A protein has these predicted regions:
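Metal-dependent catalytic cores of enzymes that make or break cyclic nucleotides
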Residues: 6-210
Length: 211
């Protein structure tokens, strides 16, 4: 299922693969520094695998919005935000799947990876640890990838600039603990971005908004 969106969107490329790897290294550091989260290797594997499903709901978004080479109108942006709910509806249809833990994790990620620590995200306006941890981690990974890769509506920005933007809250607020782990794995994120770069990835310097 996670590969379907790569055929619909001109901006995805190896995005799904990077998100899985970013999520893994972020959670590995969090497991080391915050054992209270109970993040053993098995749990990290489930979360990083389920991270591949985070944008599956974009298959329900019209191509004209998904691949628009410019800023979205307010109405288009509201429609784009529906990908979180549409993805959950798709995953709910798989309720008889044998791996229920994976499916539950994927559902949480799909629905809540655009939530933010201060309640300013969507679709539910969750705040703090009411946001599932797996969705919090994928939110950081997704934001970094959106900033550092070319999209149809923007050019990539350098990794160092993206790093500072996330820490400064310019892309919404994230968990302070996750941001501490993000600092620790900054080099790994940059290395993974290079290793799994999209073909013909450019390193330009501007962006408009994240979708």
């Amino acid at each position: 299922l996670s590969s379907i969106i790569e055929y619909r969107s001109a901006e995805t490329g190896r995005h799904v693969q990077r998100i899985r790897m970013f999520t893994r290294v972020l959670l590995e550091d969090l497991a080391r520094t915050c054992p209270e989260y109970g993040l053993d290797e098995a749990r990290i594997q489930v979360i990083s695998s389920a991270a591949a499903m985070h944008d599956i709901g974009k298959v329900a978004i019209p191509d004209a919005i998904l691949n628009k080479p410019g800023p979205l109108t307010p109405a288009e942006y509201e429609r784009m935000k529906d990908h979180t709910i549409k993805g959950c509806e798709m995953l709910a249809a798989l309720e008889k799947a044998t791996d229920r833990d994976y499916l539950h994790c994927a559902y949480n990620i799909c629905r809540s990876h655009h939530e933010r620590w201060n309640g300013a995200g969507y679709p539910d306006g969750l705040r703090g640890d009411a946001i599932p941890l797996e969705a919090q981690a994928v939110g950081v990974a997704d934001c970094y990838d959106a900033l550092t890769t070319d999209r149809v509506y923007k050019q990539a920005i350098p990794p160092g600039e993206a790093f500072q933007m996330i820490l400064n809250g310019e892309c919404g607020q994230f968990s302070p603990r996750l941001l501490e782990s993000f600092k620790q794995v900054r080099g790994q994120f940059a290395a993974l971005a290079r290793r799994y770069a999209d073909d013909a990835q450019a390193g330009a310097v501007s962006y408009t908004h994240l979708r």
